[in-house]
Structure formats: structure tokens, C-alpha cells
């Protein structure tokens, strides 16, 4: 999926960048991520869409700022991204888990990782693959092997992890979705 290439590009953008550059580049990547993926908010409120897009883009800028430009950059990018997604899933308003990396892996190769560690572990594995691609482009084969190995290990663990047994019990669930006029326009 495109997430791997996008994260490899983000890693390259952060390499050797000053704090101001990392913040700015993270912000621009945030705009590129959130402008299309939360555009549905315009159906509710266009000003709210603009505010949400800017707030989440700044959030990603801060994540990029937390990543050091040299030593440990790739490991820090993985950790900062997962921390950022975790915080976005809890704040503001009790959590706004929009545009998480796991959404792009629903039918992707890392989807089974959710059984072991949920959406955050999918995010971790996705960023690890992205940083592995980045390392390959710069001929850092050892770093690429470590990052890709970590992602593959998570994938293998998720495949061999126990799935549980059906209990034979059933429950009835009711789900109601509104769809009438809401006075939002």
C-alpha cells in the first residue's frame, strides 16, 4: 500500500533536517494525509473541517519534531508515530481516531497484526516497513533488515497466535444509525 512509500518519504524528509524543518515537513505531510481523508467532515461543517485538518496537521508536525534528525531517527519515527496515533485516539473530545494507519491495512498485508495488538501495533508495523524501505533506498541494508524483520516478526506472531474457540453462545445486537435531517447546513 501507499502508506509504506509515504512513510519512507517522511523518513527521508526528516533525515538531517533542523527542528524547524522537521516541524514544517511534518505539518505538510499532515496536510497531505488529512485534507483528503477527513474531507467528509465538510458535509457537517466546513469551518470544522478546516480547523480539524489544521489541528491534526500540527499534531503530525509535532510528531515529526520529536524525531531526531540523525542517530535513532527510524526507531524514534516508529515510536513517535505510534504515540501520536495513541494520543489522537484519546484526545480531543475523548478521541478522534481518524486516518490511522490501520485503516489503510484493512485489506493489506498487515491486517492480521490487529489480533495481537490492535490498531497501534498495525501502525507500528506499517511505520517499520516504511522505514525499512527508506533504509533500502539509502543502501543501509542492516537497518532495512532490522526494520523489515521486526514487521515480519509481528506478522508471523499474529498468524500463529491463538485465535480462541467459539463458545457456542449467541447474543442479539441492535444497531441504529440516524440519517434524517440534522440541520447542519
Where are these regions (language model features)?
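Soluble catalytic regions of membrane-associated enzymes that act on cell-envelope
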Residues: 161-185
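Membrane-embedded alpha-helical bundles of multi-pass enzymes
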Residues: 1-164, 183
Amino acid at each position: 500500500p501507499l502508506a509504506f512509500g509515504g512513510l519512507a518519504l517522511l523518513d527521508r524528509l526528516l533525515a538531517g533536517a533542523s527542528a524547524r524543518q522537521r516541524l514544517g515537513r511534518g505539518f505538510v505531510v499532515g496536510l497531505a494525509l488529512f485534507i483528503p481523508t477527513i474531507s467528509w467532515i465538510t458535509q457537517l461543517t466546513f469551518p470544522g473541517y478546516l480547523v480539524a485538518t489544521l489541528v491534526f496537521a500540527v499534531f503530525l508536525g509535532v510528531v515529526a519534531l520529536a524525531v531526531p534528525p540523525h542517530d535513532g531517527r527510524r526507531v524514534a519515527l516508529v515510536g513517535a508515530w505510534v504515540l501520536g496515533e495513541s494520543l489522537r485516539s484519546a484526545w480531543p473530545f475523548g478521541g478522534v481516531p481518524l486516518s490511522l494507519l490501520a485503516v489503510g491495512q484493512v485489506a493489506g498485508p498487515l491486517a492480521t497484526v490487529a489480533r495481537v495488538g490492535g490498531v497501534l501495533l498495525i501502525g507500528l508495523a506499517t511505520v517499520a516497513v516504511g522505514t525499512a524501505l527508506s533504509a533500502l533506498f539509502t543502501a543501509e541494508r542492516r537497518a532495512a533488515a532490522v526494520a523489515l524483520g521486526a514487521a515480519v516478526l509481528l506478522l508471523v506472531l499474529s498468524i500463529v497466535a491463538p485465535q480462541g474457540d467459539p463458545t457456542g453462545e449467541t447474543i442479539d445486537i441492535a444497531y441504529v444509525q440516524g440519517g434524517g435531517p440534522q440541520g447542519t447546513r
